């Protein structure tokens, strides 16, 4: 990961000195180390409380912010206990080493063509977050976790023991618990299309009825889409979805489709990028995890149904990905699109994910 998870304005780890007041980042940078902004928390009582609340997010192992600090806290437990057992009482500092989202590669390479990541404008490729205070605060929790796991090993719960689900189950993530289907055998047999968490736009909360999120739906016994009372649905789209499910029908809004189709002008450029989010930047001005474009495909539909499979289909591929071919890629894009006299595109570009393709074009 990168430091932006903890330091970017969009990350949400900011606190204020009063309601609607000045916002301060939870971490401030000193050299190449990000440290907790304890000084700003002393400005007002409100700031102190707000600071502790934001810091508490780092102490939630299931939050987006607490996962890595929790891992580091367990490492601290193991390291310190091993050192003490060996009679070594030297203090150890604990930092989270992450890639620097502000580092832009300058393109330097050695004699063998390998990237050389020099310090650029005071920015290092790897930066550090000081987690000494956070990992120390985690130690009491780590001890409880160890005791809990030891109790599970000593006396496992029967398979059908009633348990609750929560964010610790990590459904749909790469850390998803492998045992959740054993805890909820009935849920295992619910078809995916009939799951209660399949309402459009990930609608899984019904706050007026005391249910917040997909886990609470399951814990309250609402496992299937039609378990949720129809009267709870307030969105028109959800009502349509439920009606289609209950009656086995389809809903097709031809008027909306026709309105959208009428805006399309020929030729249509069916366009798609392929990218590689490389952790280490490979080419000049790239940053860590930048979506590095290595291929595009273009299919030009000249008129309704008119697209010659030879003349109107183009693919640009940086097959080896070792050389920087972004300039050639951009020129190939320009060469295959038609433009009006004022520089605007002649026709319509269609992409599966418009915001993604637009973002890559802006970066190029």
What are these regions (language model features)?
Residues 1-3, 272:
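Short acidic loop-to-beta-strand element that houses the catalytic metal-binding Asp/Glu
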Residues 4-5, 102-104, 186, 276-280, ...:
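Flexible loop/turn segments at secondary-structure boundaries
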Residues 9-26, 256-343:
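Conserved RNase H-like, two-metal-ion catalytic cores of nucleic-acid enzymes
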Residues 14-69, 76-180, 187, 317-347, ...:
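Metal-dependent nuclease catalytic regions and adjoining charged, substrate-binding loops involved
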Residues 75-79, 217, 228, 234, ...:
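Conserved catalytic-core segments centered on acid/base and nucleophilic motifs
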Residues 169-214:
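Cys/His-rich short segments
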Residues 175, 181, 213, 266-271, ...:
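Structural beta-strand/beta-sheet cores of well-ordered domains, especially the beta-sheet scaffolds
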Residues 200-267:
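N-terminal accessory regions of nucleic-acid-interacting proteins
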